[in-house]
Design a protein with these regions (language model features):
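N-terminal cap/lid segment of alpha/beta-hydrolase-fold proteins
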Residues: 1-29, 279-280
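The serine-hydrolase catalytic nucleophile loop
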Residues: 40-53, 67, 252
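Catalytic nucleophile-loop/oxyanion-hole region of alpha/beta-hydrolase
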Residues: 43-47, 70-105, 280-286
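Conserved alpha/beta-hydrolase
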Residues: 54-74
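Primarily recognizes the serine-hydrolase "nucleophile elbow" in alpha/beta-hydrolase
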Residues: 92-171
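Alpha/beta-hydrolase
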Residues: 163-229, 236
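Short beta-strand/loop motif that positions the catalytic acidic residue
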Residues: 234, 240-242, 246
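Conserved alpha/beta-hydrolase "acid-adjacent" motif
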Residues: 247-253
Length: 311
C-alpha cells in the first residue's frame, strides 16, 4: 500500500493506492481500479481497508481517499460537510486513478457507503466512462431520510439538528467560531447519529485521523441531497446494498434507486442497521457480495440483469 496525493480544486487530497495482487481481472488495457471513500465525516483509515484489501487480493487496484477538510487531506474549513465538494473530490480521485500505472482508465469502479453511497450514483451518472458502482447502506434521498429520522429518532432530534445548524450559520456570520456537533453519541444528545448502540458500533472501527465532530450547518443540506434523481441516468452495473433495519438511511429509498437504475441494478438487502456494515459477519457478507458482483460484471462477456435478493 502506497501513500499518494492528488489535487481537487487546488487542494491536496491524501490517498492510499493498493496494487492488485493478481492479474485475474486484467485485460489488454490494464487492471480495473476501485475508487472509494467513506460517508459523511468518515476517513480512509476507518474500516475501509476491510474492503480495499480483499479487492486488491481479487485483482483490482484500489484508490482510497480522504475528502478535502477531513483526515489527512488538506483544506479548510475542517470537518465541514459539503455534498458538492465531496462529489468534486470523487471526480478528482477518478482522474488520478485513471493515470495510475497498469490501470485501465475505462474500468473504474466507484465504491461508496452511507452519504458516499449516494455520491457514487451522482458521480457515475455524470461520468459515463465509469464501469461499475457499489452503493452500500446508501443515503440516496434526503427527504426520505428526514422523514425516516423523525420516525426512528423523534421530532426532538430534528429540532436539535435545526437549532445546531442555525447556531453555526448565524454564529459564523457574526464572526464566532464554528459550532461543532458530535458525529456519534447517545440517544437524546446533539450527535448526528444518536441512535442506541451507535457509539458502541462505530468507535471501535474509527481510525486515528477521524474526529467525532462536524460543523452544525450540515443539517441544512440533508433535504437537498437527492442522488436518487440521478439513478436513471446510470450507464453501468450498480450493486445497491441497503440494511432493512437501518435507522439512518431508509431501505425503501435504496430500493427505489435500484428500480430507477433498472436493467443495470442488482439489489441485495441485509437485516442490519446502518453501522453494522463496517465490522463483523454482515461486513463479511456484504463484502462477499461485492466481490461476486465485481468478478461477474467486470468480465466483458457477462450480461447484466436487474436482481433483488435478501440476505
Amino acid at each position: 500500500m502506497k501513500q499518494l496525493y492528488f489535487y481537487s480544486h487546488g487542494v491536496r487530497c491524501a490517498a492510499w493506492h493498493l496494487t492488485a495482487a493478481t492479474d485475474a481481472l486484467a485485460g489488454e488495457s490494464g487492471r480495473p481500479c476501485v475508487v472509494m471513500a467513506h460517508g459523511f465525516s468518515g476517513t480512509k483509515d476507518t474500516a475501509l481497508l476491510g474492503f480495499a484489501e480483499p479487492f486488491a487480493a481479487a485483482g483490482l487496484d484500489v484508490l482510497v481517499f480522504d475528502y478535502r477538510g477531513f483526515g489527512e487531506s488538506e483544506g479548510v474549513p475542517r470537518q465541514d460537510i459539503s455534498i458538492p465538494r465531496q462529489r468534486q473530490d470523487y471526480h478528482a480521485a477518478i482522474a488520478a486513478a485513471r493515470h495510475l500505472p497498469g490501470v485501465d482508465p475505462d474500468r473504474i469502479v466507484l465504491w461508496g457507503t452511507s452519504y458516499a453511497g449516494g455520491h457514487v450514483i451522482a458521480v457515475a451518472a455524470r461520468d459515463q466512462r465509469v464501469a461499475a458502482v457499489i452503493s452500500m447502506n446508501p443515503a440516496v434521498d434526503g427527504v426520505a431520510t428526514l422523514a425516516h429520522l423523525r420516525r426512528t429518532c423523534g421530532t426532538g432530534y430534528l429540532v436539535r439538528s435545526t437549532v445546531n445548524a442555525l447556531r453555526d450559520v448565524i454564529g459564523s456570520a457574526l464572526g464566532r467560531p464554528a459550532h461543532m456537533v458530535p458525529v456519534v453519541g447517545q440517544p437524546g444528545s446533539n450527535a448526528v447519529i444518536a441512535t442506541s448502540g451507535s457509539e458502541e458500533a462505530w468507535l471501535p472501527v474509527a481510525g486515528p485521523t477521524w474526529r467525532n465532530e462536524v460543523r452544525g450547518r450540515h443539517a441544512l443540506g440533508v433535504a437537498f441531497n437527492r442522488p436518487i434523481t440521478k439513478a436513471g441516468k446510470l450507464n453501468c452495473p450498480i450493486l445497491v446494498q441497503p440494511g432493512t433495519d437501518d435507522r439512518i438511511a431508509p431501505a425503501v429509498a435504496a430500493r427505489k434507486a435500484a428500480r430507477r437504475a433498472g436493467y443495470w441494478a442488482q439489489l441485495r438487502e441485509y437485516p442490519t442497521d446502518h453501522l453494522d456494515f463496517y465490522d463483523g459477519p454482515w461486513q463479511q457478507r456484504a463484502l462477499a457480495d461485492q466481490l461476486d458482483f465485481l468478478k461477474r460484471d467486470l468480465a466483458p462477456t457477462q450480461g447484466h440483469l436487474y436482481e433483488t435478493h435478501s440476505a
